[in-house]
């Protein structure tokens, strides 16, 4: 069960990702359990969990990072966007297979759709269906472990907070360079190049 008490507004060191981060995962967007949009109102892009075998010590839980989608399905330009994701079994739904469920958020320069509002009244970011589109994901930090919840509303509220923690964490200088490409190190430039290579 989720512990009581307030959540930290940011996670990860201010100096930037530390091992094992950043973690690279990629794959085609596949159909998930069909609950993200229908039951939760939180659309997700699921990718096969095969790449997790390269990270056997990675714990289940909620993470944040940046994603890029193959532009051939959308526009001529690849955009890197912030993301919050779940890796695990989702105890609330008693899943028996591990999944990688990614919620792609709007650019940090846009107003946050999850900053305010009670569960059930928040408008999470929505994108058109893109099943089969290749997605590259760079995981930059860990937010929290998986929890079971007493209600669907409690789950949605925690996901809303996850989105805000991800946004606040990514707005720090050492992280925002992954999105903007400005004032970034050679290592970050290489990782951005990988993100946008399809």
UniProtKB/Swiss-Prot annotation:
Zinc or magnesium. Residues 1-27 are annotated as: Disordered. The gene is fmn1. The active site is at 101 (nucleophile). It catalyses: riboflavin + ATP = FMN + ADP + H(+). Pathway: Cofactor biosynthesis; FMN biosynthesis; FMN from riboflavin (ATP route): step 1/1. InterPro entries: Riboflavin_kinase, Riboflavin_kinase_bac/euk, Riboflavin_kinase_dom_sf. Catalyzes the phosphorylation of riboflavin (vitamin B2) to form flavin mononucleotide (FMN) coenzyme. One of its GO terms (cellular component) is mitochondrion. SUPFAM superfamilies: Riboflavin kinase-like (SSF82114). This is Riboflavin kinase. GO terms for molecular function: ATP binding; metal ion binding; riboflavin kinase activity. Coiled coil: none annotated. Its EC number is 2.7.1.26. It comes from Aspergillus oryzae (strain ATCC 42149 / RIB 40). Pfam families: Flavokinase.
């Amino acid at each position: 069960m989720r512990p009581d008490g307030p959540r930290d507004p940011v996670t990860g060191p201010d100096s930037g990702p530390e091992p094992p981060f950043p973690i690279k995962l990629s794959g085609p967007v596949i159909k998930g359990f069909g609950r993200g949009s229908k039951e939760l109102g939180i659309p997700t892009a699921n990718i096969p969990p095969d790449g997790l075998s390269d990270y056997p010590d990675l714990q289940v839980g909620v993470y944040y990072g940046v994603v890029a989608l193959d532009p051939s399905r959308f526009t001529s330009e690849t955009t890197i966007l912030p993301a919050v994701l779940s890796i695990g079994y989702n105890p609330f739904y008693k899943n028996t297979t591990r999944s990688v469920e990614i919620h792609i958020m709007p650019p940090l320069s846009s107003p946050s759709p999850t900053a305010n509002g009670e569960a059930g009244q928040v408008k999470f970011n929505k994108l058109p269906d893109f099943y089969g589109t290749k997605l590259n994901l760079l995981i930059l930090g860990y937010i929290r472990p998986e929890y079971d919840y007493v209600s669907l509303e409690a789950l949605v509220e925690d996901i809303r907070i996850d989105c805000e923690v991800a946004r606040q964490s990514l707005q720090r200088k050492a992280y925002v360079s992954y999105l903007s490409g400005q004032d970034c190190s050679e290592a970050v430039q290489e990782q951005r190049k990988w993100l946008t290579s399809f």
